[in-house]
Amino acid sequence: MIDDDQPTSSHPAQQTGRRLITFTDDSSHEERVAALQAVEGVDTVASSADVTTESVGPEIFETADATIFERLGIAVADVGPVALESLDAEAEQNPVIVAVEPEHVVRALTTVAHAAHTHLRDGRLSTWGLQATKVTTCPLDGSGIRVAVLDTGFDLTHPDFAGRAIVSRSFVAGEDVQDGHGHGTHCVGTSCGPKAPATQCRYGVASGASIYVGKVLSNAGSGSDANILAAMEWAIANGCAVISMSLGADVATPVAAYEAVGRRALAAGTLVIAAAGNNARRPGDPGFVGSPANSTSILAVGALAPDLRMAPFSARATPVDGGSIDIAAPGLDVYSSWPMPTRYHIISGTSMATPHVAGIAALYAQSTGKRGRDLWEALIAGTQGLALPVEDVGAGLATAP
C-alpha cells in the first residue's frame, strides 16, 4: 500500500539494461526480424503476431533475445555490451531502424498527502473532482467505449464493481491482476467507477464504460517500458478508444519509441493519456514533464487543487519538443476506490488527474463518435479556461460534454 507520509513521485531515472528499437512505419515483419537477427547475440526473435491478443503477456519476453510488438512497430532487446555495439552499428546502416534507446524503469506517480483545500469539497453525492469537471451534470456515462487503465492492476473483489464486466491481463511476471498496491484500483475507480456506489459519494466519471485493466506495474509500484508497450499493444488490439497511464519516469528527453507508439495509436483510433509527473516542488522548482507524457502524440495531464490552482507537485512544461502540458484535471486530495478491506482512499498526484481526463474522453467518444486525433481535439475544445500559465495547465480544465 502507499504510505501517504512517504513521497513516491520523484526517483532518478533507472535503466533496465534492455534496449527499445523503433522501426519505420512501413517496415515489414520480415525486415524487422532481419534487422534484429543481424545483431550479434540476438539469436531468437519473438513477435506479438505469433500469439493471440489474449496471450500477449510477460512470458513473451522469457524465451527470446528480442521481442517485436507488431502493431506498435517497436522491439525490446536484451543485449549485453558486445551486442549493444553491434545493435548501434546495425541502426547506423539499416534504414528500417529509426532509433535505439535505453529501456527505463517506470513508477506509479503518486505523491504525499496535502492539507485539504476549501474551494470545492467532496459532497454527499459526488467528489470535488466530478463537480469541478461538470461530470455530475452530464447525462453521458461512456457506454460502448472501451477504456484501458495500465497501472498496478485492480481489486477484482471490490464490491462497488460487482457484476461489472472487466477484461484484465497482467504484464508483470509472477503477478496476477489483483492489485496489491492500490494505485491501479484508485485510477480505475476515478475513470470508470459506478454512478451510485452503495455506501459513499460518487467518485467515477464514465460509469458505463467497458473496463480493460492492464497490470504493468508490480505490487511494489514499479515496472518497465516493455511491460507498458506490451499492454498498449493489447489495448489497441482490443479496440480501446482510450488508454490511461498514471505512470512515468523522470526522463526529460522524449523517448522516440513512445512518440511513435502514440502516433500509431492515434492512427488506430486510440487516444493515449499520461500523467505529466510529480517532480515539481513549487514555488521554487517547477519540475519537468517526464516520459511517456513528454511525447507530442500522448496527451499530458497536469494536476489541479480544489481551489483550481496548480497542485504544488505538478510538473510544468519545458522547452523541449513534446515537453508541454496539454490539459489539467483534479489531482489533489482525490477520493476513489481502494483494495479491500480499506475500500476507499484519498491520495494525490498527476496520476489522479489522468483518470479524470480518461473518463471524460470516454464521454466525448460516446457523444461524438470521434476517435484518435479527432477525440483529442474534441477533448481540448471542451476545456474550461483557467487564469493560470499555459505551461502549467495547457488548454485548461478538462470538462464533460
What spans do the regions from the language model cover?
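Solvent-exposed loop/turn segments at secondary-structure junctions
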Residues: H104-A108, G153-L156, F171-V172, A196-P197, ...
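Extracellular S/T/G-rich loop segment that most often corresponds to the catalytic His/Ser-adjacent loop
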Residues: D151-G153, G290-Q366, K370, W376-A381, ...
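N-terminal domain-start motif of subtilase-like serine proteases
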Residues: I2-P12, V79-E92, V112-V149, R169-D179, ...
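Structural recognition of the beta-strand scaffold that forms the well-ordered cores
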Residues: L20, V76, V147-V149, G189, ...
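Short glycine-/aliphatic-rich beta-strand segments at the starts of folded cytosolic domains
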Residues: Q14-T24
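Subtilisin-like serine protease catalytic core
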Residues: T136-V167, E175-A226, A241, A267, ...
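C-terminal subdomain of the subtilisin-like protease fold in secreted/lumenal serine endopeptidases
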Residues: Y203-A206, M232, I236-G248, V255, ...
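Autoinhibitory propeptides
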Residues: D4-Q14, D43-R124
